[in-house]
Amino acid sequence: MNINKIALIYNKDYKSLAIIEEIKKLYNYCEVEEAEVIIVIGGDGALLHNIHCYMHLNIPFYGVNLGSLGFLMNTLDTKNLLQNIHDSTVTILNPLLMQAKDTSGQIYTALAINEVSIFRKTNQAAKFRIDVNGIERMSELVADGALVATPAGSSAYNLSAGGPILPLESNMLCLTPICAFRPRRWHGALLLSSATIKFEIFNTTKRPVNATADFQEFNNIIQVTVSSTKDKPIKLLFNKNHTLEDRIIKEQFGG
């Protein structure tokens, strides 16, 4: 990948500003709309936020890690930055499309790169039904909530909730309960990425539920539908010696 125009996105903290000044001395940069690659300096959260902001431009993203985990990021190497981007591996992510309806009947639509989740709003456990492709698969789940995760997001909230890690090329989705109470032994399901999952929330007055698509939250939800979309592919760039697939495999062995 031959790159001449880069855009720089960063937090205005002391550490980021020092690195940005070094990068600006070495390379020319431009506005996001004119760039061939968007470089995000920070952590996974900053990268996800900016993907949501600029994914409509269909420009590849290259993350430089200044956060704590940096699962979706690359290590900092300012002197070889453009060469690393030139040699990088492209990973295509297909986000989830969430449609949520609240108690007033208003419908919200949002995209998620990691996961869509529903969760209880009070101390009362949530109660809901799960349909897959229009077929009822669980008549009632009592839990703190549930989530649907992409392969890229399977090592995040999904893993903490007890779900499996998925290889990027698996064309699967994780459906994982969050602290299931009944049925207690249900640990979730693996579904084809073509599946449509619907959550129908019960008794929302006594047991209110919120929904999230990554960091976007919606209150007092009565129904959520989740499906994968290939209409909005996201290109992430990773250093050739440390691809996202490598990271997912390493994570499964405690790395």
UniProtKB/Swiss-Prot annotation:
Enzyme Commission no: 2.7.1.23
InterPro entries with a match to the protein in the record: ATP-NAD_kinase_N (IPR017438), ATP-NAD_kinase_PpnK-typ_C (IPR017437), NAD/diacylglycerol_kinase_sf (IPR016064), NADK (IPR002504)
Enzyme class: transferase
Family: Belongs to the NAD kinase family.
Catalytic activity, reaction form: NAD(+) + ATP = ADP + NADP(+) + H(+)
Active site: 44 (proton acceptor)
Pfam families linked: NAD_kinase, NAD_kinase_C
Functional summary from the UniProt entry: Involved in the regulation of the intracellular balance of NAD and NADP, and is a key enzyme in the biosynthesis of NADP. Catalyzes specifically the phosphorylation on 2'-hydroxyl of the adenosine moiety of NAD to yield NADP.
GO cellular component: cytoplasm
UniProt cross-references to Gene3D superfamilies, sorted A to Z: Probable inorganic polyphosphate/atp-NAD kinase, domain 1, Probable inorganic polyphosphate/atp-NAD kinase, domain 2
GO molecular function: ATP binding; metal ion binding; NAD binding; NAD+ kinase activity
Cofactor(s) of this protein: a divalent metal cation
SUPFAM superfamilies reported in the protein's UniProt record: NAD kinase/diacylglycerol kinase-like (SSF111331)
Name listed for the protein in its UniProt record: NAD kinase
Organism expressing this protein natively: Rickettsia canadensis (strain McKiel)
Compartment annotation: Cytoplasm
List of residues binding NAD(+): 44-45, 49, 114-115, 144, 152, 155-160, 216
Keywords assigned by UniProt, alphabetized: ATP-binding, Cytoplasm, Kinase, NAD, NADP, Nucleotide-binding, Transferase
PANTHER family, sorted: NAD KINASE
Gene Ontology terms describing biological process: NAD metabolic process; NADP biosynthetic process
